[in-house]
């Protein structure tokens, strides 16, 4: 394995959600520990599942993994980090300032921006703590899905330059004082990330066009900010021995080989390793040990076929239920890589085919929609909330309004204020709230961003709800976006997941988060199911049998409505292929 050769002190795994970077980072940590290395495995993912993989509770302090000698682990929970960060800043001023001032400061520190800063603080501390490298030979970071990872890794440079040029702080950066004390740490973190002698970045992908395109963008963006020591790992490759088993296996194998032969520009030059698709889920040390075996192609498996597709669990039944309301907001939520874009497009096309007026829109920073929906329908409008464009529009609006009467020094300060990372969150939310107003007259189908971004989006929505409620007081009736999201008559939230242990668990966690915000998911879609795909391939049959318990968990514990969507022989791009999903 190329990525395992001469590993430096820091190793980062990144990639779209669901590609297996947690499994590979855990397997790498086990491999290094078995070679006698002292290893620290760190998760900075908001939906962390390292503890689930090792069947052990892992918190925000370093602790040994009981099943693997020489391996320790740490999970950084951004929400917990934000709470501790708030306490550090607010507690010292309680009793010194009036209560309303303290409450105002606390509220300013309750948004998504503070959560990012707090998580970044912990991330930076690990990268710049020299004592850790006396305790550990390698520190492995299991990072979040691609969009979040890029932002996380860009933060050192962004905050470092922002603090350097704006020593007086800025209105939207509540915890600036705390950041100022650690300015040298940020510079050292950037230095460590950019040093190929100390840091290696492993891009993890599956042999799917959209996943490879996203990894190529990640490669370009990280290279542009100085992280050039990159390797590529392609996970879940179907072995050639399965190709002759049946039509589905042959189609999957052919599709993967074509993708491998036509890697996007930039990726083909990277040192690359391929990992075979495994018959079992990657949970537990014994399963993980076999993952990095280059010669582990499956040679013999029992011939077992999953049972037929269950009744009333097709996507068409779900769409028929949605159509009865004749209009409304349909929001698809879930971890990145589970197929939200494709499911949103399939539902939108199906509703449009039924004669309804439909607006399909996305806030996904990766912008997959244009590639997924390659065609047009008369009564289907397709749009994208572009984070970059919306941020620029928001900046200009603020400069033209709030900045109109400022002197030159004030304008410069405001411009710097608008360069902070939280500005994009505000801008995207404002665009999002404009779109959902249309749902009173037609169907609005939203393909939302991956899990971490979705939670930040909902946090922004809640903050906006509180602000409107505060301003309106008792003056009359009003409806905020949050109120619309909470109303199942007007909004149907669909959770999209895969029939695998970790994606189901993460979707269940997302459901809990939504319910705490007063939002109750209307149904679940389990995508890419082999269990209902009628395959005769022994390996694919084994994978299908692994799905059944997870489908039962969703059905019995989490979802009031459920749809199963099979793995397709051809990638579902274009209107005709999307129609085949709704059967």
UniProtKB/Swiss-Prot annotation:
Disulfide bonds: none annotated. InterPro entries: Anion-transp_ATPase-like_dom, Ars_ATPase, ATPase_ArsA/GET3, P-loop_NTPase. It is an enzyme of class 7 (translocase). ATP binds at residues 15-22, 334-341. Keywords: Arsenical resistance, ATP-binding, Nucleotide-binding, Plasmid, Translocase. It catalyses: arsenite(in) + ATP + H2O = arsenite(out) + ADP + phosphate + H(+). SUPFAM superfamilies: P-loop containing nucleoside triphosphate hydrolases (SSF52540). GO terms for molecular function: ATP binding; ATP hydrolysis activity; ATPase-coupled arsenite transmembrane transporter activity. The keyword Translocase applies. Its EC number is 7.3.2.7. It holds the Pfam family ArsA_ATPase. Belongs to the arsA ATPase family. Anion-transporting ATPase. Catalyzes the extrusion of the oxyanions arsenite, antimonite and arsenate. Maintenance of a low intracellular concentration of oxyanion produces resistance to the toxic agents. This is Arsenical pump-driving ATPase. It comes from Escherichia coli. The gene is arsA.
């Amino acid at each position: 394995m190329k990525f395992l050769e001469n590993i430096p002190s820091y190793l980062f795994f990144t990639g779209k959600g669901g590609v297996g970077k947690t499994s590979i980072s855990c397997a790498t940590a086990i491999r290094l520990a078995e070679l006698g290395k002292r290893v620290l495995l760190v998760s900075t993912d908001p939906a962390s599942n390292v503890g689930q993989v090792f069947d052990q509770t892992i918190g925000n302090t370093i602790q040994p993994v009981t099943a693997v000698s020489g391996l320790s682990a740490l999970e950084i929970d951004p929400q917990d980090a934000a709470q501790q960060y708030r306490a550090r800043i607010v507690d010292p001023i309680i009793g010194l300032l009036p209560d309303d001032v303290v409450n105002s400061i606390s509220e300013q520190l309750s948004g998504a921006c503070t959560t990012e800063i707090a998580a970044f603080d912990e991330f930076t501390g690990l990268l710049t703590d020299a004592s850790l490298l006396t305790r550990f030979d390698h520190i492995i970071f299991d990072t979040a899905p691609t969009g979040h990872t890029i932002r996380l890794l860009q933060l050192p440079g962004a905050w470092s330059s922002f603090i350097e040029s704006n020593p007086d702080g800025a209105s939207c950066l509540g915890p600036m004082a705390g950041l100022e004390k650690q300015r040298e740490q940020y510079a050292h973190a950037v230095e460590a990330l950019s040093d190929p002698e100390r840091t290696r970045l492993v891009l993890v992908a599956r042999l799917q066009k959209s996943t490879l395109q996203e990894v190529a963008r990640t490669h370009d963006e990280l290279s542009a900010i100085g992280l050039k020591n990159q390797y590529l790992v392609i996970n879940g490759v179907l072995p050639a021995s399965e190709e002759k088993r049946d039509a589905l296996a042959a189609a999957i194998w052919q599709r993967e080989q074509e993708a491998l032969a036509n890697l996007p520009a930039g990726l083909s030059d990277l040192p690359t390793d391929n990992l075979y698709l495994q018959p079992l889920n990657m949970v537990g040390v014994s399963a993980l040990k076999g993952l990095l075996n280059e010669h582990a192609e499956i040679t013999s498996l029992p011939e077992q076929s999953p049972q037929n597709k269950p009744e009333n669990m097709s996507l068409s039944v779900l769409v028929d239920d949605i159509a009865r309301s004749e209009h409304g907001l349909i929001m698809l939520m879930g971890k990145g890589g589970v197929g939200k874009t494709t499911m949103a497009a399939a539902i939108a096309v199906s509703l449009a085919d039924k004669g309804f007026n439909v607006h399909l829109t996305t806030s996904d920073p990766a912008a997959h929609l244009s590639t997924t929906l390659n065609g047009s329908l008369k009564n289907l409008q397709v749009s994208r909330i572009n984070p970059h464009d919306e941020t620029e529009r928001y900046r200009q609006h603020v400069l033209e309004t709030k900045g109109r009467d400022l002197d030159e020094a004030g304008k410069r300060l405001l411009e710097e204020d608008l360069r902070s990372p939280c500005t994009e969150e505000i801008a995207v939310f404002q665009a999002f709230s404009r779109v959902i107003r249309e749902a009173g007259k037609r169907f609005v189908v939203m393909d939302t961003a991956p899990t971490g971004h979705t939670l930040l989006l909902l946090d922004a929505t809640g903050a906006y709800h509180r602000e409107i409620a505060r301003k309106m007081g008792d003056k009359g009736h009003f409806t905020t976006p949050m109120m619309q999201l909470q109303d199942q008559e007007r909004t149907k939230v669909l959770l999209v997941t895969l029939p695998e242990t970790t994606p189901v668990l993460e979707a269940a966690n997302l459901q809990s988060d939504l319910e705490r915000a007063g939002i109750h998911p209307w149904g679940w879609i389990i995508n890419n199911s082999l269990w209902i795909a009628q395959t005769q391939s022994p390996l694919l049959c084994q994978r299908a049998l692994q799905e059944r318990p997870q489908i039962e968990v969703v059905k019995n514990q989490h979802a009031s409505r459920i749809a199963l969507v099979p793995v397709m022989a051809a990638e579902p791009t274009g209107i005709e292929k999307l129609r085949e999903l709704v059967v």
